[in-house]
Amino acid sequence: MVDREQLVQKARLAEQAERYDDMAAAMKAVTELNEALSNEERNLLSVAYKNVVGARRSSWRVISSIEQKTSADGNEKKIEMVRAYREKIEKELEAVCQDVLNLLDNFLIKNCSETQYESKVFYLKMKGDYYRYLAEVATGEKRATVVESSEKAYSEAHEISKEHMQPTHPIRLGLALNYSVFYYEIQNAPEQACHLAKTAFDDAIAELDTLNEDSYKDSTLIMQLLRDNLTLWTSDQQDDDGGEGNN
């Protein structure tokens, strides 16, 4: 029998050493014990996989950019090598996302009780995020399918958060941040993205007195990111340059 506390301890240690693959493996094992995760464990799982997938997303962007430049050069051998390397990174990225989505569907979302709104929103947001990461690299029908799954998870989380969480709650704000990025970058719907981000920001500003002392720093940081994105997206719409949001 694997000791749960030892696994969590290993994840904490791996995080300090910035060994995120080890951290993710430890938290995957904790999740597969099929017991509800504490807030700390939930965050450890999220941080681990965000770093594991983040490294692949970053590599994929770099190689995709090189691939576009190489295609323009017309060197067939080099084009083939770059394409093969992009596909390798893509497969790794897809495997990580699938890992997380399986944990969410088979354990985490499934085991949330009706009234565990915070956990439910946290995990549904995560589900939306990982389908969004798949959408970044997918094409054609495959892309349409993962985009739809991402939208569905974000939308469900959004409804629950509006009904059961304070507008200043960091999880509700974080969801609005990522959902709006989904509209802007994946759906190419800047108006919806701006509307969602602005509403979340304004609602939080209107209820600043409800800010929990423990989450003050988290909430205000996300509000700042929402505002930064709004500024960027509004200026992008004016000069139509396109651009990436914070996520």
From Swiss-Prot:
- Give GO terms: molecular function aspect only: phosphorylation-dependent protein binding; protein kinase C binding; protein sequestering activity
Signal peptide from the UniProt entry:
none
Q: Which InterPro entries match?
A: 14-3-3 (IPR000308), 14-3-3_CS (IPR023409), 14-3-3_dom_sf (IPR036815), 14-3-3_domain (IPR023410)
Q: Which domain of life is it from?
A: Eukaryota
SUPFAM superfamilies, per this entry? Answer: 14-3-3 protein
The subcellular localization recorded is: Cytoplasm
Keywords carried by this UniProt record: Cytoplasm
Q: What does this protein do?
A: Adapter protein implicated in the regulation of a large spectrum of both general and specialized signaling pathways. Binds to a large number of partners, usually by recognition of a phosphoserine or phosphothreonine motif. Binding generally results in the modulation of the activity of the binding partner.
Quaternary structure, from the entry: Homodimer, and heterodimer with other family members.
Q: Which family does it belong to?
A: Belongs to the 14-3-3 family.
Q: What is this protein called?
A: 14-3-3 protein gamma-B
The organism named in the record is: Xenopus laevis (African clawed frog)
Species lineage: Eukaryota, Metazoa, Chordata, Craniata, Vertebrata
Q: Which gene encodes it?
A: ywhag-b
